[in-house]
Amino acid sequence: MPTKIEARLKRKNRIRKKLSGTTERPRLTVYKSLKHIYAQVVDDTTGKTLAFASSLSKDLKGQDEGDKKADAKRVGALIAQKCKAANVEAVVFDRNGFPYHGRIAAVADAAREAGLKF
C-alpha cells in the first residue's frame, strides 16, 4: 500500500503527462509543505521560471502573519502581480498532486481575483 507521499507523487506524474505550460499559457505550479506554500510560473517549452512567490518572500514578511490559509491567499495575489509584471495573462493550473482544497484552492482563488486567467 503506497504512503501518502507516494500516492501524491503518482497523482502528480499522471497529471503532468497531460499538463504542459506553453509560452502563451505557462504552468502555475503550487507546492505546500507543513509550514509554507510556494508557487511558480514555468514555461515548459523553454524550461524557464517566469515568476516565483512563497510565504517566505520578502514582499510578504512585513504583513500581518495569520494562519496558513491567509498566507496562501497572499501568495496567490503576489504570484498574480508578478505574472502581470512578466506580461503573463493566462496560466494552466498545476496542483502538483495535492487535492484542490484548502491552501491550494486559496492560492488559485486569490490569483483569479487578482486578474490571472486559468
Swiss-Prot record:
Pfam families xref list: Ribosomal_L18p
Q: Which GO terms describe its biological process?
A: translation
What are the UniProt keywords, alphabetically?
Ribonucleoprotein, Ribosomal protein, RNA-binding, rRNA-binding
Organism domain of life: Bacteria
Q: Name one GO cellular component term.
A: cytosolic large ribosomal subunit
A molecular function (GO) term = 5S rRNA binding
User: What is the purpose of this protein?
Assistant: This is one of the proteins that bind and probably mediate the attachment of the 5S RNA into the large ribosomal subunit, where it forms part of the central protuberance.
Q: How does it assemble?
A: Part of the 50S ribosomal subunit; part of the 5S rRNA/L5/L18/L25 subcomplex. Contacts the 5S and 23S rRNAs.
Q: Name the protein family.
A: Belongs to the universal ribosomal protein uL18 family.
Which PANTHER family does the record associate with it? Answer: 39S RIBOSOMAL PROTEIN L18, MITOCHONDRIAL (PTHR12899), LARGE RIBOSOMAL SUBUNIT PROTEIN UL18M (PTHR12899:SF3)
- Name under which the protein is recorded: Large ribosomal subunit protein uL18
